[in-house]
């Protein structure tokens, strides 16, 4: 697999950090949006590396892509509409579901790290 260690590290940090930011009801800040944009690029780099790797990694690729796309909806809402928009669309009742996705992501990213 292509060397994407830095993308893995950055994406992992960003997903975990952004979840905590939203869970703790912190206001939107410009740096958050920049991190969000860069994280999506890192996601695509990792996705491409998995696509170019062996066929045996395709189930991992599918799980990774589905999981991150589910997380992306939460981050996108916050990036586009701030905390107020996030709370209006998802509210506190969605935080446990979001957290479960982040925990699943953390496990998947460890599997990808093991390929490096």
Residue map of PLM features:
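Charged, low-complexity interaction regions
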Residues: 20-33, 51-58, 80-95
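Generic detector of well-ordered alpha-helical segments enriched in charged/polar residues
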Residues: 5, 9-12, 16, 62-65, ...
């Amino acid at each position: 697999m292509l060397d994407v260690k830095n993308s893995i590290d950055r994406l992992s940090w960003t997903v975990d950090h952004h979840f905590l930011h939203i869970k703790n009801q912190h206001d939107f800040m410009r740096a958050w949006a920049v991190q969000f944009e860069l994280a999506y690029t890192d996601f695509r780099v990792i996705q491409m590396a998995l696509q170019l790797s062996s066929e045996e990694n395709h189930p991992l690729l599918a799980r990774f892509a589905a999981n991150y796309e589910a997380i992306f909806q939460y981050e996108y809402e916050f990036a586009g509409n701030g905390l107020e928009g996030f709370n209006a669309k998802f509210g506190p009742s969605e935080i446990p579901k979001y957290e479960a996705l982040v925990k699943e992501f953390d496990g998947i990213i460890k599997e990808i790290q093991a390929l490096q």
